[in-house]
Amino acid sequence: MKKRFISVCAIAIALFVSLTPAALAADLANGAKVFSGNCAACHMGGGNVVMANKTLKKEALEQFGMYSEDAIIYQVQHGKNAMPAFAGRLTDEQIQDVAAYVLDQAAKGWAG
């Protein structure tokens, strides 16, 4: 009985791990599309045309406590200063996808 349970758990974990990259790629692709249509005017290439020191680069996100999906989601939903709130304009899924995209690009140095 115990061996069967362990086998079932191992299969479930293997399935989960094998499905994760495809799901992540789809989210990042959608995040890129959402970013391009809603964020790139001010944040092209991870920059910030309004507040030059508050970029979407990894170092700046870490410095300002924004290097997490939750922090970015909150910022996108609620806005701050010149940045508008997108909670009513974008779905929760779109906001989550754009947050994942921003973190992915920040980790890559916004190099593509």
UniProtKB/Swiss-Prot annotation:
Annotated positions binding heme c: 39, 42-43, 83
Q: Write down a Pfam family by its short name.
A: Cytochrome_CBB3
One GO BP on record is:
photosynthesis
Chief place of localization: other
Q: Where, per UniProt, does this protein localize?
A: Cellular thylakoid lumen
Under Gene Ontology molecular function, one entry of this record is: heme binding
Gene3D superfamilies registered for this protein in UniProt: Cytochrome c-like domain
Query: Which family does the record assign?
Result: Belongs to the cytochrome c family. PetJ subfamily.
Write the protein's name.
Cytochrome c6
Lineage of producing organism: Bacteria, Bacillati, Cyanobacteriota, Cyanophyceae, Thermostichales
Q: Which gene encodes it?
A: petJ
